[in-house]
């Protein structure tokens, strides 16, 4: 188990939180009524020198829950055909159960207390994950019920950009717009962006925190 006093350990960097990068693709903006169609998650790790890196990736196409709204505008935007059998979609329960299981293992292995969602405009992704978990009656949700790390806000501060593609490019991370609005691609790029922002702060001397002056 990791030592929470080790500032180069993941458990020591974010107050015991285990950050997991999430992106969802949906059939609308309402987490209660609109379908969750795709979800990806990237866990993170810290090396011995305290640099944050992407770790494991999980990705699922998701079947719309019974009675879910499918907004035509949203489907046209993300290009998803929920009826396409080649999607290999699974239920919300199966997708989130697999993600939650992997996240709980990561929390334990890294010596953390609880997971926290990292996402671009994080409130959107967080709301869909929480709503789907409730519909699926998944009781052991490892994620904080409201706290998130929002890479849109962090990018606005550090890079002067809030759009994911522009923030990635400003950070020196390639971004292929033709692959955008794929949950898998967006999650991978968001994970790279979050790691870059955290590591850049470390390079600038912002972490570990300077010891408080005595007297």
UniProtKB/Swiss-Prot annotation:
Its cofactor is Mg(2+). Residues 20-194 form the Exonuclease domain. Its EC number is 3.1.13.-. It comes from the Bacteria. Mg(2+) 1 binds at residue 23. Binds two Mg(2+) per subunit. The active form of the enzyme binds two Mg(2+) ions in its active site. The first Mg(2+) forms only one salt bridge with the protein. Mg(2+) 2 binds at residues 23, 25, 181, 186. Pfam families: RNase_T. One of its GO terms (cellular component) is cytosol. The record marks 29, 77, 124, 146 as: Important for substrate binding and specificity. GO terms for biological process: DNA replication proofreading; tRNA processing. The active site is at residue 181. GO terms for molecular function: 3'-5' exonuclease activity; magnesium ion binding; nucleic acid binding; RNA exonuclease activity, producing 5'-phosphomonoesters. Belongs to the RNase T family. Trims short 3' overhangs of a variety of RNA species, leaving a one or two nucleotide 3' overhang. Responsible for the end-turnover of tRNA: specifically removes the terminal AMP residue from uncharged tRNA (tRNA-C-C-A). Also appears to be involved in tRNA biosynthesis. This is Ribonuclease T. It comes from Yersinia pestis. The gene is rnt.
